UniProtKB/Swiss-Prot annotation:
InterPro entries: Cyt_c_assembly, Cyt_c_biogenesis_CcsA, Cyt_c_biogenesis_CcsA/CcmC
Gene Ontology terms describing biological process: cytochrome complex assembly
Localization of this protein: Plastid, Chloroplast thylakoid membrane
Function: Required during biogenesis of c-type cytochromes (cytochrome c6 and cytochrome f) at the step of heme attachment.
Name of the protein described by the UniProt record: Cytochrome c biogenesis protein CcsA
Pfam families linked: Cytochrom_C_asm (PF01578)
Gene from which this protein is expressed: ccsA
Oligomeric form and interacting partners: May interact with Ccs1.
Membrane-protein topology: Multi-pass membrane protein
GO CC, one annotated term: chloroplast thylakoid membrane
Top-rank lineage group of the source organism: Eukaryota
Keywords, in A-Z order: Chloroplast, Cytochrome c-type biogenesis, Membrane, Plastid, Thylakoid, Transmembrane, Transmembrane helix
GO molecular function, one term: heme binding
The organism of origin for this protein: Piper cenocladum (Ant piper)
Membrane-crossing residue ranges in chain numbering: 17-37, 41-61, 68-88, 143-163, 227-247, 260-277, 288-308
Length: 321
């Protein structure tokens, strides 16, 4: 009973902290002049990560198996994965451009996990015979970590598409304004020197602004590629370990049930992304579009089987088995 109570306390603490973190990040976005909020954002994510780690360890000790047997446990583990990616990205890149995505992903996973829909799964249960294997830790942890990494990388690609699309619209508007100014300049009389100077300053300011936008989009593309590359590696390991486990449990490496089918589709989509990203003949927009499609495919792969409640991977679905 003590472990269950402690589990509930850690769940509510982590969810409260991550909610405050999102609010702080929103304030920081709206009012960038407030410098002190950056430290509180990082401390909040680190505290949340420790709380979820403690929760998973307690549940592991209490249930005597890795807490990845149902949707509630996998969502909490995915939330832990988002916070872990946030911490490591902060270590690699001090600017931490992933903070919005990782913090938002963590709070949505926790919000759904602690909602009333999954109340029946909050209590630890004995594993079914097929899941009582040492491969559980290897296969499920790799798959969930790959989902977290691929979701982060895909969202960066979505952000890249949105920014590039907006930038193209702004360029068209500025070209129209520029042509109008040139036309006005040619048709009008000679203007004072101050106005010419002001015009040149505006041109240089726009060029400076576009250069920084270009740098930012390049960073988004770079980090999207690195994170998706990591997620693709983890996904490959997860699929291979799952195939070995399936052969031990059911006597076949692959059965084409809904989960396996969508996992293969996910793997194919991100393999296509890596191919287009490394192909010099294709611009970065092509790979970003592929990654954006992959974002939707991951959610179908992750929640699809749980919504259907069929197939060999239907353990821990919404309907009780």
């Amino acid at each position: 009973m003590i472990s269950i109570a402690l589990e509930h306390v850690l769940t509510h603490i982590s969810f409260s902290i991550i909610s405050i973190v999102i609010s702080v990040h929103l304030i920081k976005f709206l009012v960038p002049e407030i410098i002190g909020l950056c430290d509180s954002l990082e401390k909040g994510i680190i505290t949340t990560s420790f709380c979820i780690t403690g929760l998973l360890i307690i549940r592991w000790v209490y249930s005597r198996h890795l807490p990845l047997s149902n949707l509630y446990e996998s969502l909490m583990f995915l939330s832990w994965g988002f916070s872990t990616i946030h911490i490591f990205s902060k270590i690699w890149n001090h600017q931490n451009d992933l903070s919005t995505i990782t913090a938002t992903g963590a709070i949505y996973c926790q919000a759904f996990a602690t909602s009333g829909i999954l109340n029946e799964m909050h209590q630890s249960a004995i594993l079914v015979p097929a899941l009582q294997s040492q491969w559980l830790m290897m296969h499920v942890s790799m798959m969930l970590l790959s989902y977290g990494a691929l979701l982060c990388g895909s969202l960066l690609s979505v952000s890249l598409l949105v920014i590039t699309f907006r930038k193209n619209i702004e360029i068209l508007e500025k070209m129209n304004q520029f042509s109008f100014l040139i036309e006005s300049f040619l048709l009008s009389e000679v203007r004072p020197l101050k106005k010419k100077k002001s015009f040149l300053q505006n041109i240089s300011f726009l060029s400076f602004k576009n250069y920084h936008k270009y740098q930012f989009t390049q960073q988004l593309d770079h980090w999207s590629y690195r994170i998706i590359n990591l997620g693709f590696t983890l996904l490959t390991i997860g699929i291979l370990s799952g195939a070995v486990w399936a052969n031990e449990a059911w006597g076949s490496y692959w059965n084409w049930d809904p989960k396996e089918t969508w996992a293969f589709i996910t793997w194919t989509i991100f393999a296509t992304y890596l191919h287009t990203r490394t192909n010099q003949r294709m611009p970065g927009m092509h790979s970003a579009i592929v990654a954006s499609i992959g974002f939707l495919i991951i959610w179908i792969c992750y929640f699809g089987v749980n919504l259907l409640g069929i197939g060999l991977h239907s353990y821990g679905a919404f309907t009780s088995n």
